[in-house]
C-alpha cells in the first residue's frame, strides 16, 4: 500500500483537484516497478461528510488510478465509514480508534460486525488502529488516553482478538511500528511526538504491546513479563501479566 498525500482537508478550488491528479499520476509512474505494491491509496481521512468537493475529487482520483495502472487495486483509508465500492474504488479500509479518542476498545468488534452487515460478502480493511504510550508512563489499570504502557497493551489485546476472529478483514495495519515526529501534538511524555508506536522513536525500546504481537505472530518460543518498567509501585500487591507463545 502506497498512498497519495491527500489527508483531511479538501479544497473546492479546481487547481487543488488538478494538483491531486498530477500527484497520483506521479506516484504511480515513479513507483509502479516495485513488486511489493498491491494497492494505490488515493487519500486518508478526507472530509467526505463535510466538504461537497470531496466526493467528486475522490471519484476522479480513482479513475486516474485505473487508467494509470489497471492491474493493481485502488483503495482509501477513511474514518468516515464509507462502504465497499465507494468512489468507484476497488477496496476501502478504515481508521478506527475506539477506546482511544472515544468510546472503549470493546466497541470495536461490534462495529466490525455492523460494517460487515451493511456490506455482506465484501471484505473490510483496517488501515489504522492504535493507542499511545510512553515507556515511563504507567498505571494499573490503565485508562483511555493516559499514555500508559498498560493501557496501550490492553487496547491491542482487545483489538487483535477481534481481528483474529474475523478473517474477512482483509488488512490489519497497526498505527504504528515506531513513535514518530508530529509537530501539532502536545500529549504523552514528549511534545511533538505521536507515541502510538510499538517501539520508541529511537528504535531502542520495545513497548509491552510489541511483545503481545510477538507472542501471537512469531513461532519462536518466547516469554515476556509486562510492566517491567513500572517501578516503584504504589500498592503492596500487584497483578503480573505475561505474554508467551509456549
Task: Annotate the PLM regions.
Residues 1-246:
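Extended substrate-binding grooves/exosites of carbohydrate-active enzymes
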